[in-house]
Amino acid sequence: MGSDRWKNIGGTPQMEDSAQEKTQRKGCGYILCTVLLSVAVLLAVTVTGAVLFMNHYHAPSTEPPPVITTNMEDPNALVTIERADSSHINIFIDPNCPDPFPRLDGLQSALLSALADHDSEQKVAGGKERVLLTSLSDQVAQMVSQVARQRADWEIVKKVQNGLGAEIGALKNEQGRLIKLLSEGQSHVVQLGSSVSEVLETVQRELGSGRPRLKADLQRAPSRNSRPRGCANGSKPRDCYDIYMSGQQEDGVYSVFPIHYPSGFQVFCDMTTDGGGWTVFQRREDGSVNFFQGWEQYRDGFGKLTGEHWLGLQRIHLLTMQTHYQLRIDLEDFENATAYALYNTFGVGLFSVNPEEDGYPITVSDYTGTAGDSLGKHSGMKFTTKDMDNDHSENNCASFYHGAWWYRNCHTSNLNGQYLTGHHASYADGIEWSSWTGWQYSLKFTEMKIRPQREEN
């Protein structure tokens, strides 16, 4: 009994030790299952997150996304992932662990719901992108249509501009033709006037009241030492030639009384050059008078008769309207060389009812002399000043060349230009007579004067 008791006593600890070992082994198993289950869940979440990350950030692919499902065929597999190439990834759990499927079903449902939401968001985003692309496409179409309309409008404007250019060209051609016709008409009028004058002179000679008899009577007038202002028979002189024929044959200032201006005005008479009897209407000699004047000054005259002066366009017109006049221009350079130009036909505003409105056009022809013809090309032109542009140039020739003259486009002579001393660097803006000294030499002395055409006895 003692022995049995010993066995019992000794055996009891062994039985208690065996139960304790079972309990420890069972606790370790639960811990191990829990750890494995946690690892499996974490692995499933990680794989699912990786798949979602790849679906969200990677470029679009034609391959279908992996399919995540529970494996009904293998009860030990927690999750099965099927790839596009039909391969599978199974996540297993220990069969000795407690049943985790109720919790895993919830996790699976949540994962599938997240995937569905992600797909829905992608579909919504894709729909928005399609709407945006459609809107952009419509806007681009509208812009293309607008550009097409603008191009069509531009083509229309271009055609209109081309048409206007052609019309302007035609108008310019017509203007040139009209100017040519007017010039030819003026020449014909001048010729007609000359013919009429010749007829009148013929009639005068036939009636016995011609100028030759008057000249013979005047040549028997008082001697040149006497200085009465007027003709010997008491009639008023019309110009310096009448004064000369009355016996007053010294240079100086005299009064003349044109037919259409009986109150008269004073002029300077050149009684020595080429037989005398010249009425001076322009002189340049020292630059003391500014000839860059306006229209009114050139119409009425300025300066001093005994020095530099311009008699005035209106007075020149009144003188040359009386009979046929010739023009003499005397020139001198700074080397004291001299030359002259003689025009047997000269007049200002000969065929004008209102010469000022017509611009006091010049008529000049029949050149002889030593200076060359630098005025003939100006015949028929109106007078231009810095404030009255009557020339054919786009610019005002008077302003451009600092003078006043019967400019065309622009000049071959400029006797009312700046008083410069001989050669100058500027172009054609001095006292120029191009046929004698060119366009860059300003003359020292000029004198323009008129006298009735001389008649043979």
Curated annotation (Swiss-Prot):
Question: Where does the record place the region Disordered?
Answer: 1-20, 216-235
Residue intervals on the Extracellular side: 55-457
Tell me which domain of life the UniProt entry assigns to the organism this sequence originates from: Eukaryota
**Pfam families from the entry?**
Fibrinogen_C
Q: Sorted alphabetically, which SMART domains does this protein's record hold?
A: FBG (SM00186)
Give the positions annotated as glycosylation sites. Answer: N233, N336
Q: What is known about what this protein does?
A: Acetyl group-binding receptor which shows a calcium-dependent binding to acetylated structures such as chitin, some N-acetylated carbohydrates, and amino acids.
Quaternary structure, per UniProt, is: Homotetramer; disulfide-linked.
What is this protein called in UniProt?
Fibrinogen C domain-containing protein 1-A
Recall the taxonomic lineage recorded for the source organism.
Eukaryota, Metazoa, Chordata, Craniata, Vertebrata
